[in-house]
Amino acid sequence: MPQDIRISPDGRTFFVADMLADGVHVVDGASFKQIGFIPTGTGAHGLYPSRDGKYLYVANRGTNKMMVKKGVARGSVSVIEFATRKVVQTWPIPDGGSPDMGNVSADGKYLWLSGRFDDEVYRINTSSGEVDKIKVGREPHGLAVWPLPGRYSLGHTGNLR
């Protein structure tokens, strides 16, 4: 079940997160044919390119289900290197969690993700993978990161240009 799509920095390849396949389909932009698959983790959901265009962060919810009880999901973030199309790092959410949707900060230092099933938001250091958890209201689904540093909005992911 496709959940998110992003295009490679060179504009030639699509990356499609598939929640039921637990990974990312790689699709040629000219032929629209699948040319690969990258296993990332259970419930691959959101895709977020790094600001330098080297990496693609994949939010793996830790479950394939549409709804789960709080504390059940064991999510992670996979880091795919665009150049090799391989997972180069995986960052588990400590003590479980359900990374869902969000974006990268304007300075590229943090990946912000909603933790839909755990009533929290994750701030993940893109250099170390260190995760900070912030308790928020019930079932945050998406997180828009404004280009102006320090501005965030819970609700749903926005593509800001």
Q: What residue ranges belong to the model's regions?
A:
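Predominantly soluble domains enriched in secretory-pathway, periplasmic, or organellar proteins
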Residues: 1-161
